[in-house]
Amino acid sequence: MHDAALIIGLVGVLIFAAHLFEAIFRHTRIPDVLPLVVIGILLGPLLGIATPTSFGAVGPIFTVVTFVLILFEAGTGLSISSLRKTYQETLILTTVTFILNVALIGVAAHYLTGLGWVRSFILASVVGGISSAIIAPMLGQLNMQEDGKAVLLLESSITDVFCVIAALSFIDISDFGDITQFDIGLAMGKMIASFLLAAMMGTVGAFGWSYIFNKVRGLQNSMFTTAAIVFVIFGIAEWLGYSGAIAALAFGITLGNISSLRLPKLYSGFNTDFSGLNISEKAFFAELVFILKTFFFVYIGISLQLANWWLIVVGLILTALIFIIRLPVVKFTVLKSTPVTDASMLAIVIPRGLAAAVLASIPFQQGMEGGDIIQNVAYAIILISIIITSLLVFLVDKTRFSRFYAWFFPNLGKQSKAVD
């Protein structure tokens, strides 16, 4: 009974702490993700008060539920006009970044860890992309224009798929033992299908749901029915082998812009008046995501495993390489009209997170030689990238460090106005 009382009390403290960290952010510009992850590390790896096994099967399910709602809620805040303006830029930035990350991190990991080439590229693929689960809840706190936020959110969602397909493909190569037996065309086909069909499912699902939404609103306690539909679409997409994350994001984007989207009437008796989220519903989901992300980031901190100090140093070196790679990629791929502040954020807001943590555990669980090294280095990169991202956001926003990026991006647009 005392343990239950302690846990309930801790839940209340964490919620109050999350609001405090958000208030601190408004003054310091340090994202609240950092102190929440640090709390998790204190409770988990350092003090041993909690471990991922303490949550049993609930922990992984909770992370997926939170991840889905975070993507959906972030999608509702994106405008179609911003997506139209930034999708080409996003695809170029995402693809170039991911390819360079996998190539250079793979080579560096091979020489720093002694892993074989294929296993080094497994590690590189695992940490090759930024985390939508970390970035989506940070967007509202970043000093960026809407177009820049759209680029970050889309990139993080796309690279989650890149990481999954690439990492599993290299694991297949490791199983084959011969790269010539690997079908790269099949892997590319899976990737394209995962994007397009998942996006189609999310979009069609949003139109279908919005058509009956007004009728559902008449039911008692119907606020959470939209979230239920998001879970259904995510589950179906994943079950079919597509990207549930892309489906959830597409659902949110479509539902958030439904008032500006019109389908032609199929026949005169068909009413095409679609309904999106109202103000109270948006506020409900924003508050729900705020509470869930609080426990989500603490859980990530608890889940991190930092057992070998040399591998932590390797993680630090590889994380530094990730940030170095990002600078020239942003410089040569973003539009010339991009404000310097937006380009700066695109260069520094590149944390690793949920997808990397899940993928890093697969080689170890399969008993692959070097699987423990892959997992430990990946966990170190996740932690260090979150810390560096948070600190750089503060430095760029509050100190003269921003002058470095103004110097590095001399040909880009003028700086955008600060956001409170």
Labelled PLM ranges:
Residues 1-420:
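Transmembrane helical cores of multi-pass secondary ion antiporters/exchangers
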